[in-house]
Design a protein with these regions (language model features):
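PRPP-associated nucleotide enzymes
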Residues: 1-172
């Protein structure tokens, strides 16, 4: 099973933060928020905000739970555990970077956008992910993907992050 190492993930996060720092919106000094989708996307968002702040760029951090906005709740049989969102600011007029670990069908990103509208009207929203594995079912594409993998629908992509999983790698 192919693996992307912790070191490769760290280098990818450095490049991701550098990409954000070089965007015209950030260069202009516009207010920036990095919001992660619980549970791995919020860890990535926190890491990105830390990198941005070390580079002198102020960025708000937030996390959203999309559980109640999923379009497959009726298909799952049991109700999945809901976690809390942490978005202690209005998103009005912000440049908002929505982050997640893996982009596949696009359904999670769609649900996340729906949650965001409840917190205000951002000036701009971009979707960034650690891994784009393809397999879209909705017309959603990432504005930035650290890794683009070519996998079949049957193959799984597993992201482990130290803060949640106690280990760090991507296997596929």
């Amino acid at each position: 099973m192919p693996t992307i190492s912790k070191e490769e993930i760290e280098r990818a996060l450095d490049a991701w933060a550098e990409h954000l720092l070089l965007t015209p919106v950030v260069q202009s000094g516009a207010p920036l928020a990095v919001v992660g989708i619980v549970s791995h996307g919020d860890v990535l968002a926190r890491r990105l905000v830390n990198r941005l702040e070390k580079a002198g760029c102020q960025a708000l951090y937030g996390a959203i739970d999309i559980t109640l906005y999923r379009d497959d709740l009726d298909l799952r049989g049991s109700r999945p555990a809901q976690r809390s969102s942490h978005l202690p600011f209005s998103t009005d007029d912000l440049y908002l970077v929505l982050t997640d670990d893996v982009l596949s069908t696009g359904r999670t990103a769609r649900a996340a956008l729906e949650v965001l509208w409840e917190y205000g009207r951002p000036a701009k929203v971009e979707f960034h992910c650690l891994v784009d594995r393809g397999g879209r079912q909705l017309p959603i594409q990432p504005d930035y993907a650290a890794f683009n993998l070519t996998v079949t629908p049957e193959q799984s992509v597993r992201v482990r992050l130290h803060e949640i999983d106690g280990a760090e790698d991507i296997t596929f």
